[in-house]
Amino acid sequence: MKRRRVLAATGSAAALAGCLSVPSQQPSSDRLLEDALETVSTVEDVSARRALTVEVPDSRTERVADVTKRPPTDRRLEMVDSSDLSVPAGAVSVRTTTTTWEYDPETDTAIERHHPNRILADVNRLTLESLREEYDHSYSRTDTVDGRDAHALLAKPDHDEDELTRSIEFLVGETAYQIPLERSDDDALEDPTVERLVWFDDATRYPIKERTTVRDGEAVVSELTLTYEDLSLDDGVGEEPFTYEPPAGSTIETVGTEPVGIYDSRAEAAEVAPYELPEPEIPGPFERDRIVVLEKGDELGTSTTLWYGDPDDPERELFVAVRDEQRFDPDALEGDRIDDLDVYCRDGRIQTLFWRCAELTYEVSSPYSDEPLEEVASSIGCPSV
């Protein structure tokens, strides 16, 4: 569970080293987004102080937090100052691939959330791809943010105003915010518009500030501003920021099913799994990352999930799951034939092949549509028959 990407030997990597000290030539908005996507795809770790302000006509909320991230999922956030009663100063959130801890100092309660089989996704990458593909964008201006030379990009949704729903959800940093487009059930906005300004550090092209403004005609309905201060990339933060021990005496609550175990080797997992584990042939560059054994009672049974990832691209994943209780509906899926297997296909955000062998069911899945799922399924076959 310690896969790390290798920085590509490209111009972006040179930029990360800080070789640019003056504003570069004005780039196009397309170039800004492409450079930013390359940066967030190769950066190893990020540390910053994050200042967030949310303003509406009758109130203003501020949060200041220290953030350490190791993309795509590891993150530590410590709230330094906050006027938001729901997230007070002293609140802590620590997330890894398999677990999230959230500590509330007001109640002295720590919540441990288990998610050992969650697909990895880099929020910054998804946000940048959304800006590139779902917004009309243009270069706005040069600027200075926290003493850094920066380029600002202006973006507006590329769909008609009639398509705007009751609310628009924005991914800002590591948090999803809903900005209402109706003041109340009986008071819809008459002429809503949304405008986003995103600032990119000139030296690294990392996004360091964002402002999202919702207007009704000329009136500002809400404005959200986020700024990264004292930004540092690739400092080698190590494991310590992503480990967490609740304060002594605090109340601990658990959400989600705690796994029987998370194992590095097949032999260790085989000792606790109640059935024979498959031995799939996984193509390179995939390497096994972890094996998760979960027990979910008589109704859902025991599942064992073998996770594989690309060491140079942590978001590129593939997993094989075996279960003693069937969780797919053949009548709702498209059937196919692979060698001697009757498989059922599911398309969508995750591409999946399901099949049944005697008392066990198997699944091969990946969020990437071009992965060799059929070859992996064929290599597993029906080991339980």
Question: Where is each model-derived feature located?
Answer:
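N-terminal leader/targeting segments and the immediate start of mature chains
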Residues: K2-V64, T68-T73, T142-T144, T251-A269, ...
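N-terminal mature ectodomain segment of secretory-pathway/periplasmic proteins
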Residues: V22-P23, R31-P105, P157, P180, ...
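Short, hydrophobic/aromatic-rich segments at coil-to-beta transitions
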Residues: E44-R49, P72-L77, G147-L154, E182, ...
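Flexible, processing/modification-adjacent segments and terminal tails
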Residues: T96-L189
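Gly/Pro-enriched, hydrophobic low-complexity segments
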Residues: D146-A248
